[in-house]
């Protein structure tokens, strides 16, 4: 019980500090206003917002090793930005924040979950990171395409999700055929 409480206290402190940083960015630094003005002055189309948020969340959580900290930093910034630029994309921008944060945390070599997973499995930490990266990058690429489509279609969830799943299935099929071909060549070479 006490070990579990110790882990919860650490997580709670990280979450509280992330909310504090998010509040400082929102209230004192006016980050949402800055981001909104930046997007408007650079001429970036609002349709790119979910995809850009996904990429930003992925990089931030990869660098920090925490998805919850990234939630606390980005969500208070993304909500007002999405509401002012393109309100139809608010939910997809929030989804992109969550998905990008979890992706970056999953791939980060400094993430507590990655460290505990490799230790629990009894494998080399960097080997674990590199083997997880292949699968995570595949899904992240399909997700990024989905976020681009949902932004371009102004929130068409069915088209976005369907396209992402279709691309993932095609990629999986191609990789499966490729691996069978490689394995068959190895079998032929070993019998000669």
Question: What do these predicted ranges mean?
Answer:
Residues 1-30, 47-59:
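Core transmembrane alpha-helical segments of multi-pass membrane transporters/permeases
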Residues 47-61, 86-106, 131, 137:
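Alpha-helical transmembrane segments of multi-pass membrane proteins
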Residues 12-18, 51-52, 73-78, 158-171:
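Hydrophobic mid-bilayer segments of alpha-helices in multi-pass membrane transport proteins
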Residues 2-7, 33-41, 115-119, 126-130:
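Short amphipathic alpha-helical coupling elements at transmembrane boundaries
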């Amino acid at each position: 019980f006490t070990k579990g409480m110790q882990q919860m206290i650490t997580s709670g402190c990280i979450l509280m500090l992330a909310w504090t940083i998010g509040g400082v960015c929102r209230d004192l630094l006016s980050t949402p206003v800055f981001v909104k003005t930046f997007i408007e002055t650079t001429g970036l189309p609002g349709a790119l917002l979910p995809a850009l948020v996904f990429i930003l969340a992925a990089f931030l959580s990869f660098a920090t090793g925490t998805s919850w900290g990234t939630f606390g930093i980005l969500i208070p910034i993304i909500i007002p930005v999405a509401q002012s630029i393109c309100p139809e994309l608010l939910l997809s921008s929030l989804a992109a924040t969550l998905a990008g944060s979890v992706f970056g945390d999953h791939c980060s070599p400094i993430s507590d979950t990655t460290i505990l997973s490799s230790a629990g499995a009894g494998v080399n930490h960097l080997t674990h990171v590199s083997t997880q990266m292949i699968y995570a990058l595949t899904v992240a690429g399909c997700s990024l395409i989905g976020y681009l489509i949902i932004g371009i279609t102004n929130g068409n969830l069915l088209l976005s999700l369907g396209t992402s799943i279709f691309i993932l299935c095609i990629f999986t099929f191609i990789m499966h055929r490729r691996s069978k071909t490689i394995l068959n060549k190895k079998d032929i070479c070993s019998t000669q």
